[in-house]
Amino acid sequence: MESQARVKFYCDEARCIDCHGCDVACKEAHHLPVGVNRRRVVTLNEGLVGKEKSLSIACMHCSDAPCAQVCPVDCFYVRADGIVLHDKEKCIGCGYCLYACPFGAPQFPKSGIFGSRGPMDKCTFCAGGPEETHSEKEYKLYGQNRIAEGKVPVCAAMCSTKALLAGDSDSISLIIRERVLKRGSGTASVPYTWSQAYKD
């Protein structure tokens, strides 16, 4: 990916086929422990023929991230491109970020003999963490750093129907607009695209 103003994810529910390729790719690429799902597919109206819609959900890297606002140890930080990351070595596992996140993105692996929470884990937009880029420590704590390699996140790269889009908000917004107009839905549904929802 080239230099962006602000990066975002968008899942086109008209294209998502509930294959779980995105969440499996994420889990495999980052070697996530059992119980930690940085990305998940949710089906709305399940069982209602013709009304089912599936969405791939993860951290949305909010412009004004509520998780960062409630963290008592300030383990969150926002990169210049808008990616919201956290420092696992600062995290105390309190869970405030989970309660604040409208997407349920923060995940807490169990650790210790009594099943206490370990440091929080969440989607990193495949941008690693605060450790040295491509270091063994960064990979162990945060997984692949595809952004440093100029690639899109693995979940979006593996989406066979291109329902899951990742990249700079302007480019994603243009793709969404084109798709909506091609579907014949008109411009009535366009205002909910990233260019309006997330002002830089």
UniProtKB/Swiss-Prot annotation:
Protein's gene: fdhB1
UniProt keyword annotations, A-Z: 4Fe-4S, Electron transport, Iron, Iron-sulfur, Metal-binding, Repeat, Transport
Cofactor note (record): Binds 4 [4Fe-4S] clusters.
InterPro entries on file: 4Fe4S_Fe-S-bd, 4Fe4S_Fe_S_CS, 7Fe_ferredoxin, ET_IronSulfur_Cluster-Binding
Residues given in the record as [4Fe-4S] cluster 1 binding sites: 16, 19, 22, 159
Species lineage: Bacteria, Pseudomonadati, Campylobacterota, Epsilonproteobacteria, Campylobacterales
One Pfam family it belongs to: Fer4_11
Cited function: This chain is an electron transfer unit containing 18 cysteine residues, 16 of which occur in four clusters.
GO molecular function term, any single one: metal ion binding
Name of the protein this chain belongs to: Formate dehydrogenase iron-sulfur subunit
Subunit annotation: Formate dehydrogenase is a membrane-bound complex, formed of at least three different subunits.
Domain 4Fe-4S ferredoxin-type: 7-37, 50-81, 82-111
Annotated residues for binding of [4Fe-4S] cluster 4: 71, 91, 94, 97
The species this protein was found in: Wolinella succinogenes (strain ATCC 29543 / DSM 1740 / CCUG 13145 / JCM 31913 / LMG 7466 / NCTC 11488 / FDC 602W) (Vibrio succinogenes)
